[in-house]
Amino acid sequence: MAAALLMMNMHGAVMASDCDRTIFRYSEKIPFAIMVDPRSELPWEDIIMDYQAKRSISNEMSFMDCATDFRQYLTDLLKLKDSNTRKNESDKQVVCIGYDPNSIFPKASIITTAITERGFMINRPIEISNLPKSVCLQMLGNCENIRILLGGMSDDISQKIKDLFFNKISDIVGNKDSAKLIKDFGNYILEKLESIQEDTKVLEAISFFTIKDMVKMAENLIETEGLLNSNNSAISPTHEIGIVTLAEGFVYIKHSLYGA
């Protein structure tokens, strides 16, 4: 298994992962952090070290400028990789966390990689923290059990519903092209409904959490995902937990690389 999640509110952000080398800081002084998809096969520790050495961001830059700078760095880097590597990295996500100058609320954005007709692309950062008080919950990797526990549905069940919807519409319309247009609209509606049902209750609860509460919940969710995914009932330990706050910047409270 490979699962990671970001939990964030006005107090700060908490990241947790069951894999090493998935949560990174830019520097001790700048509260800017990066969490990568734990399924990615790229050497992220080397990538982040190279980014720190070659690029320069500052506290005066807006958060989205920092995220965009990292996205541009990744774009330039992956151009140098072979096609098989780029193909394997398709549909992976990178989350950036930080602060705007003179702002007390944290922000987060997500960068997604994709294979399109034009080739490999790294999409522009999309802010995911524009709700009141920066409340956010973002999952990366294999988090199907977490989604179900939090009141949503698994991707597998969701896909079966969409396929059934498409097949029935095709039978009624009798035209595949028309049915596809209706399917696309139906998918949009289903995704919005899922998002509303899954997020509303959970995000409302997260908005009241302290940093300590978020650390406990994030770690418990990651370890529960490991337990439910394991064939021998052995809990997959949480390897990394990182916290980003305005007062303390980025802090590791658990990092197996350092024996914590």
Predicted stretch roles:
Residues 1-260:
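N-terminal nucleophile
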